[in-house]
């Protein structure tokens, strides 16, 4: 501990989300970056709170103003941030619909959400049917520009579309120019529409830089909920640190497809922080991006 540090002691369990150095054995960080962890919690469970659950929590509570009973739509509901959204939304007493492939529907249902098979059904039409034409109060979309346009159609008056990734760029299903046009609509054109709907893009690192105390408070809340036994993240796999490089290449989507419905425990390192940009980041720790567009947007705090 540094000479000016107070409120912490050697041996205390603390959590942080370093942008660089997350795989090292020892790391020097600013004392005001760390959040104390409740005594006795599984450190692997605590890891889950830092990225996936904080992302989900801040989108649900900071980006949106949701009330118990409100309906939301979660894309990629079987993924890391997706399952965090499902569990936290259940705690907030929200009605949840989640798009996922059929192999993940039991996992989605285990969180009390209604699955939508995006491969064999039009999710826009399904939301219209399930909500009797009312739409949902919020959509959380990690897919990308083309999907944002369709998701916006699902938003009810007074609701919000929150983009937080661009997965289809990494799979080649969407071009970079198409994604940038999607950003233009998400952050510009749709905000000018007088239709009572709103849109935004969420990035955990840029928000943390701008609002560090908010970030610490939110992580502390999640750690407390974890310590109280209110949160039980879905498990993909836990790997030793020495296998971290191999873990980065692991097909995360397939891992979640193989989860036993209702299984509970830590996601841990093997979760791989896949959804900082919907899977567009090759390594959050090294800052290596798969597409120049994502690096450009990240550097500008998007």
Outline where the language-model segments fall:
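C-terminal hydrophobic helical "lid"/dimerization subdomain
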Residues: 209-258, 262-263
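Glycine-rich phosphate-binding loop and adjacent beta-alpha segment
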Residues: 146-230
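Short amphipathic alpha-helix with an adjacent loop that forms part of the alpha/beta core around
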Residues: 123-133
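Mid-domain Rossmann-like dinucleotide-binding core that forms the NAD(H)/NADP(H) cofactor-binding site
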Residues: 53-121
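A glycine-/small-residue-rich N-terminal strand-loop-strand element
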Residues: 1-19
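NAD(P)H dinucleotide-binding glycine-rich loop of Rossmann-like/cofactor-binding domains
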Residues: 13-76
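Conserved class I S-adenosyl-L-methionine
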Residues: 268-302
């Amino acid at each position: 501990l540094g000479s000016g540090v107070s409120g912490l002691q050697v041996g205390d369990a603390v959590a942080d989300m370093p942008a660089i150095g997350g795989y090292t054995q020892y790391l020097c960080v600013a004392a005001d970056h760390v959040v104390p962890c409740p005594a006795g919690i599984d450190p692997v469970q605590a890891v889950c709170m830092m990225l996936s659950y904080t992302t989900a929590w801040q989108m649900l509570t900071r980006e949106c103003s949701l009330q118990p009973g409100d309906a939301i739509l979660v894309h990629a509901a079987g993924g890391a941030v997706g399952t965090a959204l499902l569990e936290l939304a259940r705690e907030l007493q929200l009605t949840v619909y989640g798009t996922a492939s059929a192999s993940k529907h039991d996992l989605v249902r285990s969180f009390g959400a209604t699955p939508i098979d995006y491969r064999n059904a039009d999710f826009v039409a399904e939301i219209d049917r399930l909500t009797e034409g009312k739409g949902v109060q919020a959509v959380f979309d990690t897919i990308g520009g083309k999907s944002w346009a369709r998701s916006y159609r699902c938003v009810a008056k007074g609701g919000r579309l929150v983009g937080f990734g661009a997965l289809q760029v990494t799979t080649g299903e969407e071009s970079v120019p198409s994604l940038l046009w999607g950003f233009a609509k998400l952050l510009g054109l749709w905000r000018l529409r007088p239709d009572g709907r709103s849109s935004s893009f969420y990035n955990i690192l840029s928000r943390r830089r701008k609002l560090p105390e908010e970030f610490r408070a939110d992580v502390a809340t999640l750690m407390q909920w974890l310590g109280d036994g209110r949160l039980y993240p879905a498990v993909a796999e836990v790997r030793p640190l020495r296998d971290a490089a191999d873990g980065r290449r692991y097909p995360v989507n397939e891992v979640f497809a193989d989860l036993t419905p209702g299984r509970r425990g830590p996601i841990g390192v093997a979760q791989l922080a896949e959804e900082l940009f919907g899977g567009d980041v090759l390594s959050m720790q090294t800052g290596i991006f798969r597409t120049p567009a994502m690096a450009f947007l990240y550097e500008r705090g998007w």
